[in-house]
A protein has these predicted regions:
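Phosphate/ribose-recognition catalytic cores of enzymes acting on nucleotide-derived substrates
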Residues: 12, 67-186
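Classical nucleotidyltransferase
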Residues: 1-77, 134, 154-171, 178, ...
Length: 186
């Protein structure tokens, strides 16, 4: 990672008929913007800083799969999104963001990581999102999730009722900040 030089890569390319053109690294503050730096920001849950370095929001794609059913049972269904294992995911926590389904973008309350209240479940999700205002079946559909900001880190609650109140509060705040109706993009 980052151990080569433009000259070495240019020689490698020349042997394979590929022209290599080097460029200067972008600098933010006193450090270069690199993929490693961006991955570290994402891993720390700082999706706002990562977006600044990327020039866009950090997002992932996946397919909606059946989940544990706890969200639906508590009144806020979630889309459990299967993401490739090698994708850098943000720190465990609740995020405000957006979910794109087909040609529509919905505001979303997103949970990244294993929810602490259900950590013993064999089918614990890594990424689940409540698409605010969405009603319909998403199973098997491709969804893109864009992370806008962290709302709070993951934590355990003293009871299921306390968890429900917290999630309802998260969803209500995100709905207020981002809206409850989709935006058509296609």
């Amino acid at each position: 990672r980052g151990a080569s030089t433009v000259d070495v890569i240019r020689a490698w390319g020349a042997n394979r008929g590929v022209e290599v053109t080097g460029h200067e690294l972008l600098i933010d503050g006193d450090a270069p913007i690199t993929a490693t730096r961006i991955r570290r920001l994402i891993a720390a849950g700082d999706v706002v800083a990562a977006a600044g370095e990327l020039g866009r929001r950090f997002y992932v794609h996946g397919v909606v799969a059946p989940g544990r059913g706890e969200g639906t049972g508590m009144g806020f269904p979630t889309a459990n999104i299967e993401v490739q294992a090698d994708i850098q995911m943000p720190a465990d926590g609740v995020y405000a963001g957006f979910a794109r389904v087909g040609g529509e973008v919905w505001s979303a309350a997103i949970n990244a990581g294993v929810p602490p209240m259900f950590a013993d479940s064999a089918a614990s999700a890594r990424l689940e999102a409540n698409l605010i205002g969405y009603h319909g079946d998403l199973y098997g559909r491709e969804v893109s999730i864009a992370f806008d900001r962290m709302v709070r880190p993951s934590r355990s609650f003293e009871s299921i009722d306390a968890l429900i109140r917290a999630v309802e509060g998260d969803i209500a705040q995100i709905a207020t900040d981002y809206g409850t109706t989709p935006v058509r993009i296609a």
